[in-house]
């Protein structure tokens, strides 16, 4: 059994496991991974949606950070989740160097096999829409941000 140095306590066991797994990938790739999530009021979100939302946004952030070869640029992922005005707000920011093309709040992939790419964010949006939430995407030269808003109307 692999030793787990980092203990996450988001109040959701599945999310804690996902975060621990992603943290170990970040550690192997010298990516600073900061997490601050309180999931206490969000246990109405179903397990497949927790997996879809968090795995996809973190995987995308890791992929963008791995592309950074310039050692003067810190590879960094900041993931926060908190309740603001009866909304669970998830915000993931990561450093990047690759150009991100946005069209109608959708990421246009730069990958050659585009058929299979872009599915991650589509999965995130599909999961978020089940809870009447929405997703906002922002990209500038060196930072990508995805913000998710999920109303707390189910508890």
Model-predicted regions and their roles:
Residues 7, 11, 33-54:
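Conserved short strand/loop->alpha-helix "switch" segment adjacent to the catalytic nucleotide/phosphoryl-transfer site
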Residues 11-29:
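Short beta-to-alpha transition helix within the HATPase_c
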Residues 120-124:
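Short alpha-helical Gxxx[C/S/T] motif in the catalytic ATP-binding
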Residues 98, 140-147:
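Glycine-rich nucleotide-binding loop
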Residues 63, 67, 86-118:
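Glycine-rich/acidic phosphate-handling loop/turn and adjacent ATP-lid/helix
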Residues 71-86:
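Short beta-strand/loop element within the Bergerat-fold HATPase_c
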């Amino acid at each position: 059994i692999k030793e787990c140095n980092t203990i996450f306590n988001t109040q959701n066991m599945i999310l804690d496991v996902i975060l621990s797994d992603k943290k170990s990938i970040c550690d192997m790739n010298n990516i600073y991974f900061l997490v601050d999530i309180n999931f206490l009021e969000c246990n109405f979100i179903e397990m497949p949606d927790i997996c879809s939302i968090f795995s996809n946004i973190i995987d995308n952030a890791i992929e963008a950070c791995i592309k950074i070869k310039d050692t003067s640029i810190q590879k960094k992922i900041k993931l926060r989740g908190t309740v603001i005005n009866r909304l669970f707000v998830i915000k993931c920011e990561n450093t990047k160097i690759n150009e991100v093309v946005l069209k109608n709040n959708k990421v246009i992939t730069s990958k050659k096999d585009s058929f299979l790419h872009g599915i991650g964010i589509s999965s995130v949006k599909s999961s978020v829409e089940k809870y009447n939430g929405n997703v906002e995407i922002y990209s500038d030269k060196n930072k990508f941000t995805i913000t998710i808003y999920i109303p707390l109307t189910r508890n």
